[in-house]
Amino acid sequence: FGDHFGDLAPFCFAVTRGDAEAAFDAFVDKALPKFGDYQDAMLTGEPFLYHAVIALYLNCGLLDPLRVCRRVEIEWRAGRVPLNAAEGFIRQIIGWREYVRGIYWLKMPGYERSNFLGHTRRLPEFYWTGETSMACVRAAVNQTREHAYAHHIQRLMITGNFALLAGIDPHEVHEWY
């Protein structure tokens, strides 16, 4: 692993279904009630805030997307979480994650090679080092390197949006993510 981005230690993620379910349960109990208010927030020194941090478990099959959405719906129906928290979570899973997953299965493998805007610039070195005067980019890159995690706002609105506006080749962005 020596030449790869980031470090293997400390390692804090679940590797079994039971541990992934326990991590999701902890999110539901502790963070979901505030998720709706803070789902798009970034705060220095708080890499996870009120996020579920379950994409990796969904992606490798340790958690099922429909099952986690139904669990959140149950929490809302029972009055344990506000509507904005339940709606925000379910929308991100079904309305975004599953939509993008569907595009992947529909359009691959050619989709990976697409470059609609014809962007050709190389990915800047600061995506690997975090050495930039842009505080949000620096924080998102450093957090990704340190925790192997960045929430959707950091990926979409910080590192992704910078790459789009700067004309970075999407293949380089894909390889970085």
Task: Report each predicted region and the residues it spans.
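Generic helix N-cap/helix-start motif at coil->alpha-helix transitions
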Residues: 152-153
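Alpha-helical support elements that line or immediately flank enzyme active sites
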Residues: 159-163
